[in-house]
Amino acid sequence: GIKNVAKITYWDMFRAFLTGRDPKYYLFFPMIEQGKKAANDFLKRIARTEDKDDKIKLSSFQRQLKAIGVWGSREKDDLSKIKIPVWVVNGDNDRMVPTPNSYDLAERLPNAHLTIYPDAGHGGVFQYHEVFVPEAIEFFK
């Protein structure tokens, strides 16, 4: 489950170091042809030479991974009281936030709408941005 996010993240960062790739290539996209192409396209879209964000500090990064792991080990919260529409979006091959978690979340939210993008990982919304953006605009109207 999500409590393994630190292990997966560190492994993919190591793979990225060995291959000279951005860690997002491995973290957000499945390593199938469509995923690899989507990863390359995404990384080109977000490449900036100006107004770049500061890099995350190592201590902040480690605290974030620890917090996710702790949260993933907790008992599930009762979500039945949440009545507003909630859109749960994921890829069908998400290793960081395993896809079954999305189905579980959508089942426990009484007014949930679930979208699972095929052949996509954690970066499914980046991979399917041309579909996701119009759907998001419609959902939030």
Where are these regions (language model features)?
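Active-site acidic short loop of glycosyltransferases
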Residues: 83-84, 111
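Soluble, non-transmembrane catalytic domains of enzymes that act on hydrophobic metabolites at membranes
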Residues: 62, 76, 93-95, 134-139
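Flexible "cap/lid" loop of the alpha/beta hydrolase fold
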Residues: 1-19
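Conserved alpha/beta-hydrolase catalytic His-Asp/Glu region
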Residues: 23-73, 78
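Active-site phosphate/pyrophosphate- and oxyanion-stabilizing loops and adjacent acidic/basic residues
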Residues: 103-104, 130
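Short beta-strand/loop motif that positions the catalytic acidic residue
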Residues: 82, 88-90, 94
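Conserved alpha/beta-hydrolase "acid-adjacent" motif
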Residues: 95-101
